[in-house]
Amino acid sequence: MALIVQKFGGTSVGTVERIEQVAEKVKKFREAGDDVVVVVSAMSGETNRLIGLANQIMEQPVPRELDVMVSTGEQVTIALLSMALIKRGVPAVSYTGNQVRILTDSAHTKARILHIDDTHIRADLKAGRVVVVAGFQGVDGNGNITTLGRGGSDTTGVALAAALKADECQIYTDVDGVYTTDPRVVPQARRLDKITFEEMLEMASLGSKVLQIRAVEFAGKYNVPLRVLHSFQEGPGTLITIDDEEESMEQPIISGIAFNRDEAKLTIRGVPDTPGVAFKILGPISAANVEVDMIVQNVAHDNTTDFTFTVHRNDYLNALEILKQTAANIGAREAIGDTNIAKVSIVGVGMRSHAGVASRMFEALAKESINIQMISTSEIKVSVVIEEKYLELAVRALHTAFELDAPARQGE
């Protein structure tokens, strides 16, 4: 008998019919002897509908009141799923984040989980009940309802699995696992049977939408085995777990190709090359809560420097205005921007033990006449910025160059 936490997203519980299907799936696990805790999101589109109502009252709704409002979406879903289970003869009980005491900080709309009181859940499991918990929400120390931000239901599922020391946390989605890259771009992309927390964290941070990045961080911190599965198709999915050094010797060098279209590039030219120049440029950007990704600094012959960095495209206009003001303040020549870029990355723990991986990447892009504008590396990742129109060509070229189209071979 295993203790399993299952999380179903908004699409998986988007209609009453789908909720009935989820109940059938949960019932099978109970019949197999497993203890099950289910975490569900609001029905697809419901959170946006509720936010729309709030926006009709206030253009910028008060965060505390918005949390009270949007948390009702999950309350509907947990009750419906519990009813569907009880109808099938499966004892079930539903809990909101407040009822199950998912304690968070007080950062409304983006709260972080601090502690979970598992007393009620363990008592219900011992009594043979399936426990259905509302994802995405909790309560702060003053009893205020909080929400965890977009994708927070994944985090709820992982946090519950960690608190309960579950054998596995299963994340059900509209895909049957984690792929080597987006199959819509590369039809030959393969589903991965297994991937490490490190690799998944890199892929999530680089734009992979399969798992929410905070959930992966939480799972890695508390060593919660994650499995990504399709909600309505049978299959083994993808297991996300710790790196097994002996096993990884037989894994391919690269596990996946990630990409992100949501990047923008900013450059400030002719900056006097003096100590502290990076802080003078990035300090005001940071003060505006704009997150900087990749950075490149070039020193010219006339004791000036060109400083380039990337930000999320949503922050582009704000960051460009700040950079223009900074250019005037520090005597730089100009500040310019470019939104026609994209980031492509190769990810794999195999890079640690193999030399020449970056060179192989650059060669593959050069063969397609794709110019690299910026480069960033980590222990298990190499990222490049290229012109956006070449993005899909680059992904396909790299997928082929690292033999991800074909079955992985030992000793690759």
From Swiss-Prot:
Pathway: Amino-acid biosynthesis; L-lysine biosynthesis via DAP pathway; (S)-tetrahydrodipicolinate from L-aspartate: step 1/4; Amino-acid biosynthesis; L-methionine biosynthesis via de novo pathway; L-homoserine from L-aspartate: step 1/3; Amino-acid biosynthesis; L-threonine biosynthesis; L-threonine from L-aspartate: step 1/5. It is an enzyme of class 2 (transferase). GO terms for molecular function: aspartate kinase activity; ATP binding. Its EC number is 2.7.2.4. It catalyses: L-aspartate + ATP = 4-phospho-L-aspartate + ADP. InterPro entries: AceGlu_kinase-like_sf, ACT-like_dom_sf, ACT_Aspartokinase, ACT_dom, AKii-LysC-BS, Asp/Glu/Uridylate_kinase, Asp_kin_monofn, Asp_kinase. Keywords: Amino-acid biosynthesis, ATP-binding, Diaminopimelate biosynthesis, Kinase, Lysine biosynthesis, Nucleotide-binding, Repeat, Transferase. It comes from the Bacteria. GO terms for cellular component: cytosol. GO terms for biological process: diaminopimelate biosynthetic process; homoserine biosynthetic process; lysine biosynthetic process via diaminopimelate; threonine biosynthetic process. Residues 266-340, 346-412 form the ACT domain. Belongs to the aspartokinase family. This is Aspartokinase. The lineage of its organism: Bacteria, Pseudomonadati, Pseudomonadota, Gammaproteobacteria, Pseudomonadales.
